[in-house]
Amino acid sequence: MAVEKTMDKIVALCKNRGFIFPGSEIYGGLANSWDYGPLGVEFKNNVKRAWWKKFVQESKYNVGLDSAILMNREVWVASGHVGGFSDPLMDCKECKARFRADKLVEDHMTANGAEVATADGWSNEELMDYITKNNIVCPKCGKLNYTDIRKFNLMFKTFQGITEDSKNEVYLRPETAQGIFVNFKSVQRTTRKKVPFGIAQIGKSFRNEITPGNFTFRTREFEQMELEFFCKPGTDLEWFNFWKDSCWNFLLNLGMKEENIRMRDHGEEELSFYSNATSDIEYLFPFGWGELWGIADRTDYDLNKHAEHSGQDMTYLDPTTNEKYVPYVIEPSLGADRVALAFLVEAYDEEELEGANGKVDVRTVMHLHPALAPFKAAILPLSKKLSEKADEVYAELSKHFNVDYDETGSIGKRYRRQDEIGTPFCITVDFDTLEDGCVTVRDRDNMEQQRVKIEDVRAIIEKSLEF
């Protein structure tokens, strides 16, 4: 019987097992703020490491970067964020609740069975016309009496220095991409990379979202994993398809089922004016389909904008053909928090097993890919009298992996605890271990056990981490 996955179950497990806690909880919390606990930080770091491994370490084309969160204000003027990075807002005149007009429209589309529910690029007039014609009432009070739609800039503004004037105005970056674009020439010069090549970055971004929600899916502070891939104009669609396939396979190789993800290509009416193509990889969350990964062919728009505003030359001289051109950019942009949440949802399972006296025993298990699991193994001495030997096993394995140690409670309860946090292997040290140098290795997914020489355990774990 298929388990019903709900966000309530996922959130409860995350809170109870130390994956994710509400932010500032002892002070009543802060709306839509989340802290990654001991297991959560290991898990999310593993997600980031997996992305870096595939998109940087294993790619001869790509290099890394870590740019500053605070940047010169003119960067955001050039990119268009100061003038145009905004959401369409409207208030209910009756109950004073505030909503994003485009989200009201998209929610209505979804509720009425639309295959593609998007209002991207719609004007204020188009949004209001749709809301009025379809009688989309206020979700809070049920009245149809809204203010006019107005734009609200999403960037967090602050000041650098001791005086709060326009000369000291800075923003918390709303995306990591612009830090890559402004460093394009420096990276190309110092690495001697030839086009095509890419620059990858993982980092925090901030958006003053009006309607955040669904746990860590949409938050005001979030982490991005972005690649800006620079290629010769005319080869961009070929590279666009290459990176689409790479992103898709990354998710499948780490355990996502194909029926739970889909590739949605943007229609012409959705495309930005500068884009040749854009596709989103979406995941089927308990609350519906949600975007994980956006892959966009941004042409030469970004580099040209920065060249225009900075006065710096952003052209590339091809050493083979002596051609000069501004490279086109393919951008696969992935939310670290979103994809981490998707992996948690995908892994969650409840299995009905026969317990004592024929009663049904429900086993909660997280089928995380071992590469993503917070702990790769747990060392479980059968008795506290075996602690010395168990410590030796722990000391050896912890040099290579993040492993847990647990000697409290029955062995069955310890197995269940590790199942619930996704630990792939439980390694039991028993009294026979002292005689034969073997341990019992239990597999999380099928619960099968095998006796293994202590010196062979490392190889078993290493093999499981491949993807």
From Swiss-Prot:
GO terms for molecular function: ATP binding; catalytic activity, acting on a protein; glycine-tRNA ligase activity; protein dimerization activity; transferase activity. The lineage of its organism: Bacteria, Bacillati, Bacillota, Clostridia, Eubacteriales. GO terms for biological process: glycyl-tRNA aminoacylation. CDD domains: GlyRS-like_core, GlyRS_anticodon. ATP binds at residues 207-209, 217-222, 291-292, 335-338. It comes from Clostridium perfringens (strain 13 / Type A). It holds the Pfam family tRNA-synt_2b. It comes from the Bacteria. It catalyses: tRNA(Gly) + glycine + ATP = glycyl-tRNA(Gly) + AMP + diphosphate. GO terms for cellular component: cytoplasm. This is Glycine--tRNA ligase. It is found in: Cytoplasm. Its EC number is 6.1.1.14. Substrate binds at R100, E175, F222, E223, Q224, M225, E226, E331, P332, S333, L334, G335.
